[in-house]
């Protein structure tokens, strides 16, 4: 059987890092993933997916990723159930991420540092290679049927 998930989306909140009684790191986070199509109003909708990540990957995610970060994850879908305080059975479906990858630099995420502005900037000479190339076929050439070799 195949149970593989690959998602790209933005974190809906900062990852929450906890540890099990056996001191294993476990992180939980939400991922907003845009749908491929637009709705009747022409707007793109998103799915909000609950995810779990374990061990060193969980620690790294909590350390480096914050709400709004664009990440990619690979993992699997998992279902579980438990009984809540009211005695009702609750069913949960979530993605258990095996790996994640940051898809934007820190600068892109809005953590840009200010760049010093150049004080005496010299005007740049025009780049001869950026000039539009002339179309060699633009004018066309008149050819009579007598000029053709066949």
Swiss-Prot record:
A motif (Important for interaction with partner proteins) lies at residues 145-150. Residues 103-150 are annotated as: Disordered. Keywords: DNA damage, DNA recombination, DNA repair, DNA replication, DNA-binding. Residues 121-138 have a biased composition (Low complexity). CDD domains: SSB_OBF. One of its GO terms (molecular function) is single-stranded DNA binding. One of its GO terms (biological process) is DNA replication. Residues 103-120 have a biased composition (Polar residues). One of its GO terms (cellular component) is nucleoid. Residues 1-104 form the SSB domain. Homotetramer. NCBIfam families: ssb (TIGR00621). Plays an important role in DNA replication, recombination and repair. Binds to ssDNA and to an array of partner proteins to recruit them to their sites of action during DNA metabolism. HAMAP family: SSB. This is Single-stranded DNA-binding protein 1.
